[in-house]
Amino acid sequence: YGKLCNHALTGNADCGGLISYNYISGEPITGLADGRPLFVRSANDKFNLANFMRTHLYASVGVLKIGNDILFNEEKIKVDRITGHGGLFKTKGVGQRILAAAINSPISVMETAGEGGAWGIALLGSYLVNNEKKQSLADFLEDKVFTGDAGIEISPTAEDVAGFNTYIENYKAGLPV
């Protein structure tokens, strides 16, 4: 997967017009009651391996992009930092760059970024058991888990952001399919 994920970054920033939907079940953010995994393209799209892989990576954060656009643009929510964690970040720099483009924000990851859900659940368990100061989860993580580890940060490029924005508009336009 590492080679394929890295190859995806050589594709067009807008995935060459290709679109992928990874819905196994319904998705309330996009108003779909049922899931239908789907890959679509038109005859004029740039169908190649790099764009095919990139569209699947984009699809993995498509709904996150739509939800964050609501939070950031409509609700005016501000964040101090976004730290990525989970399988998307297993291949160094790839998921980070994709997510940075999606939400137009720098993304930090730490050495444990690829560990995924079990690691996150263990952190929540530690928070419940070892939170003597009754700190908020954010403060507990900052003080006990991430102390001194700012991680590695990747900022979005203008080309990637513009490409993802084009992709997500095509993605939203194709939802009725």
Task: Please place each PLM-identified region on the residue numbering.
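Glycine/Thr-rich phosphate-binding loops that ligate phosphate moieties of nucleotide
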Residues: 1-177
